[in-house]
Protein backbone atom coordinates (compact mmCIF):
# COMPACT_ATOMS: atom_id res chain seq x y z
CA UNK A 1 0.00 0.00 0.00
CA UNK A 2 2.82 2.39 0.87
CA UNK A 3 4.75 1.86 -2.35
CA UNK A 4 1.69 1.84 -4.60
CA UNK A 5 0.58 5.13 -3.08
CA UNK A 6 3.86 6.83 -4.03
CA UNK A 7 4.11 8.64 -7.38
CA UNK A 8 6.28 6.80 -9.88
CA UNK A 9 6.34 3.51 -7.95
CA UNK A 10 4.43 0.28 -8.54
CA UNK A 11 4.64 -3.08 -6.81
CA UNK A 12 5.01 -5.59 -9.63
CA UNK A 13 5.35 -8.70 -7.48
CA UNK A 14 5.52 -10.08 -3.95
CA UNK A 15 7.26 -13.13 -2.53
CA UNK A 16 7.15 -15.02 0.75
CA UNK A 17 10.45 -16.86 0.39
CA UNK A 18 13.90 -16.10 -0.94
CA UNK A 19 13.47 -18.55 -3.80
CA UNK A 20 10.23 -16.87 -4.81
CA UNK A 21 11.94 -13.48 -4.64
CA UNK A 22 14.52 -14.57 -7.22
CA UNK A 23 11.79 -16.03 -9.44
CA UNK A 24 9.65 -12.87 -9.17
CA UNK A 25 12.64 -10.65 -9.98
CA UNK A 26 13.07 -12.61 -13.19
CA UNK A 27 9.42 -12.89 -14.18
CA UNK A 28 8.25 -9.41 -13.16
CA UNK A 29 11.33 -7.53 -14.44
CA UNK A 30 11.46 -5.40 -11.32
CA UNK A 31 13.81 -2.42 -11.18
CA UNK A 32 14.38 -2.89 -7.46
CA UNK A 33 13.81 -5.66 -4.93
CA UNK A 34 13.12 -4.88 -1.26
CA UNK A 35 14.59 -7.98 0.38
CA UNK A 36 14.15 -9.31 3.90
CA UNK A 37 17.31 -10.97 5.22
CA UNK A 38 15.48 -13.62 7.22
CA UNK A 39 13.20 -15.68 4.96
CA UNK A 40 12.39 -19.37 4.56
CA UNK A 41 13.47 -21.55 1.64
CA UNK A 42 16.59 -19.55 0.70
CA UNK A 43 17.46 -16.62 2.92
CA UNK A 44 17.68 -13.06 1.68
CA UNK A 45 21.47 -13.13 1.45
CA UNK A 46 21.56 -16.06 -0.95
CA UNK A 47 18.59 -14.67 -2.86
CA UNK A 48 20.46 -11.37 -3.23
CA UNK A 49 23.58 -13.21 -4.37
CA UNK A 50 21.63 -15.05 -7.07
CA UNK A 51 19.99 -11.87 -8.33
CA UNK A 52 23.34 -10.06 -8.43
CA UNK A 53 24.99 -12.96 -10.28
CA UNK A 54 22.27 -13.26 -12.93
CA UNK A 55 23.31 -11.42 -16.10
CA UNK A 56 19.67 -11.08 -17.10
CA UNK A 57 19.04 -9.13 -13.89
CA UNK A 58 22.06 -6.84 -14.21
CA UNK A 59 19.96 -3.70 -13.80
CA UNK A 60 18.06 -4.90 -10.73
CA UNK A 61 19.08 -3.36 -7.42
CA UNK A 62 18.43 -4.89 -4.01
CA UNK A 63 17.52 -2.92 -0.89
CA UNK A 64 17.80 -5.12 2.19
CA UNK A 65 15.57 -4.78 5.25
CA UNK A 66 16.80 -6.04 8.60
CA UNK A 67 15.32 -6.08 12.09
CA UNK A 68 18.32 -4.47 13.74
CA UNK A 69 21.10 -2.31 12.40
CA UNK A 70 23.53 -4.61 14.20
CA UNK A 71 22.36 -7.68 12.30
CA UNK A 72 25.51 -9.70 11.69
CA UNK A 73 24.22 -10.64 8.25
CA UNK A 74 24.06 -7.07 6.95
CA UNK A 75 27.64 -7.09 5.76
CA UNK A 76 27.09 -10.46 4.08
CA UNK A 77 24.13 -9.02 2.20
CA UNK A 78 26.21 -6.05 1.05
CA UNK A 79 28.98 -8.34 -0.12
CA UNK A 80 26.40 -10.51 -1.88
CA UNK A 81 25.38 -7.54 -4.00
CA UNK A 82 22.82 -5.52 -2.06
CA UNK A 83 22.95 -1.81 -2.88
CA UNK A 84 22.03 -0.71 0.62
CA UNK A 85 19.97 -1.56 3.67
CA UNK A 86 17.40 -0.14 6.05
CA UNK A 87 16.16 -1.26 9.44
CA UNK A 88 12.52 -2.32 9.59
CA UNK A 89 11.46 0.48 11.91
CA UNK A 90 12.46 3.08 9.30
CA UNK A 91 9.75 5.70 8.89
CA UNK A 92 7.53 5.20 5.80
CA UNK A 93 8.76 8.41 4.16
CA UNK A 94 12.39 7.35 4.69
CA UNK A 95 11.68 3.94 3.22
CA UNK A 96 10.32 5.54 0.06
CA UNK A 97 13.31 7.87 -0.08
CA UNK A 98 15.58 4.85 0.33
CA UNK A 99 13.90 3.05 -2.55
CA UNK A 100 14.26 6.10 -4.79
CA UNK A 101 17.89 6.64 -3.92
CA UNK A 102 18.94 2.99 -4.27
CA UNK A 103 17.17 2.92 -7.62
CA UNK A 104 19.29 5.96 -8.55
CA UNK A 105 22.46 4.08 -7.63
CA UNK A 106 23.92 5.89 -4.64
CA UNK A 107 21.06 6.54 -2.28
CA UNK A 108 21.98 4.98 1.02
CA UNK A 109 25.59 6.06 0.94
CA UNK A 110 25.07 9.72 1.69
CA UNK A 111 26.56 11.04 4.93
CA UNK A 112 24.26 10.37 7.87
CA UNK A 113 22.81 7.45 9.81
CA UNK A 114 22.92 4.94 6.97
CA UNK A 115 26.55 5.67 6.14
CA UNK A 116 27.37 5.09 9.82
CA UNK A 117 25.44 1.81 9.81
CA UNK A 118 27.32 0.62 6.73
CA UNK A 119 30.65 1.56 8.28
CA UNK A 120 29.73 -0.21 11.50
CA UNK A 121 28.66 -3.32 9.64
CA UNK A 122 31.90 -3.31 7.68
CA UNK A 123 33.94 -3.39 10.88
CA UNK A 124 33.43 -7.13 10.62
CA UNK A 125 36.74 -8.55 9.41
CA UNK A 126 36.67 -9.31 5.73
CA UNK A 127 37.99 -12.58 4.43
CA UNK A 128 40.93 -11.53 2.25
CA UNK A 129 41.20 -13.06 -1.17
CA UNK A 130 43.77 -15.85 -1.17
CA UNK A 131 45.53 -14.41 -4.17
CA UNK A 132 45.42 -10.82 -2.95
CA UNK A 133 42.90 -9.92 -5.66
CA UNK A 134 41.42 -6.91 -3.92
CA UNK A 135 44.66 -4.97 -3.31
CA UNK A 136 45.82 -5.94 -6.80
CA UNK A 137 42.62 -4.53 -8.25
CA UNK A 138 43.35 -1.20 -6.62
CA UNK A 139 46.66 -1.10 -8.48
CA UNK A 140 44.61 -0.42 -11.61
CA UNK A 141 43.50 2.89 -10.16
CA UNK A 142 45.38 6.13 -10.57
CA UNK A 143 46.24 8.22 -7.54
CA UNK A 144 43.32 10.54 -8.25
CA UNK A 145 40.96 7.59 -8.62
CA UNK A 146 42.05 6.28 -5.23
CA UNK A 147 41.27 9.66 -3.73
CA UNK A 148 37.83 9.59 -5.33
CA UNK A 149 37.20 6.03 -4.13
CA UNK A 150 38.09 7.01 -0.56
CA UNK A 151 35.59 9.87 -0.72
CA UNK A 152 32.90 7.58 -2.14
CA UNK A 153 33.54 5.25 0.81
CA UNK A 154 32.97 8.18 3.16
CA UNK A 155 29.55 8.67 1.59
CA UNK A 156 30.18 11.77 -0.52
CA UNK A 157 28.12 12.27 -3.67
CA UNK A 158 29.59 13.48 -6.95
CA UNK A 159 29.05 17.17 -6.23
CA UNK A 160 30.71 16.85 -2.82
CA UNK A 161 33.63 14.90 -4.29
CA UNK A 162 34.04 17.61 -6.91
CA UNK A 163 34.12 20.32 -4.24
CA UNK A 164 36.56 18.39 -2.05
CA UNK A 165 39.03 17.81 -4.90
CA UNK A 166 38.44 21.06 -6.84
CA UNK A 167 37.00 19.20 -9.82
CA UNK A 168 33.97 19.81 -11.97
CA UNK A 169 30.95 17.62 -11.11
CA UNK A 170 31.19 16.01 -14.54
CA UNK A 171 34.85 15.09 -13.95
CA UNK A 172 33.98 13.60 -10.56
CA UNK A 173 31.18 11.57 -12.14
CA UNK A 174 33.57 10.36 -14.85
CA UNK A 175 36.11 9.26 -12.24
CA UNK A 176 33.44 7.30 -10.33
CA UNK A 177 32.25 5.61 -13.53
CA UNK A 178 35.81 4.63 -14.49
CA UNK A 179 36.48 3.27 -11.01
CA UNK A 180 33.32 1.14 -11.22
CA UNK A 181 34.48 -0.21 -14.56
CA UNK A 182 38.01 -0.99 -13.39
CA UNK A 183 36.80 -2.72 -10.20
CA UNK A 184 33.78 -4.39 -11.83
CA UNK A 185 31.50 -2.82 -9.23
CA UNK A 186 27.73 -2.85 -9.72
CA UNK A 187 27.16 0.44 -7.90
CA UNK A 188 28.53 2.79 -5.25
CA UNK A 189 27.66 0.37 -2.45
CA UNK A 190 30.06 -2.13 -3.98
CA UNK A 191 32.74 0.56 -4.19
CA UNK A 192 32.33 1.21 -0.46
CA UNK A 193 32.78 -2.47 0.33
CA UNK A 194 35.86 -2.73 -1.89
CA UNK A 195 37.38 0.33 -0.24
CA UNK A 196 36.98 -1.18 3.22
CA UNK A 197 37.92 -4.75 2.30
CA UNK A 198 41.05 -3.64 0.48
CA UNK A 199 42.20 -1.60 3.46
CA UNK A 200 42.11 1.64 1.47
CA UNK A 201 39.92 3.06 4.20
CA UNK A 202 38.92 1.82 7.65
CA UNK A 203 36.01 2.90 9.89
CA UNK A 204 37.02 5.92 11.95
CA UNK A 205 40.04 6.76 9.80
CA UNK A 206 40.47 9.78 7.57
CA UNK A 207 37.05 11.09 8.43
CA UNK A 208 35.27 7.81 7.68
CA UNK A 209 32.01 7.20 9.52
Regions found by a protein language model. Name each.
Residues 17-20, 43-49:
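Acidic catalytic/metal-coordinating carboxylates
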Residues 36, 66:
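Active-site residues of response regulator receiver
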Residues 155-190:
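Recognition helix of helix-turn-helix DNA-binding domains
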Amino acid sequence: MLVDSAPGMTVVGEAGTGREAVERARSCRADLVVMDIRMPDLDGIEATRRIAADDDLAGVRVLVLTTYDTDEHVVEALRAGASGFLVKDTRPADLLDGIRTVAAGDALLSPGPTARLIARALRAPAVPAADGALPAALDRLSGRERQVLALVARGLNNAEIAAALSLSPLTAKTHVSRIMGKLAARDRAQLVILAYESGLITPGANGAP
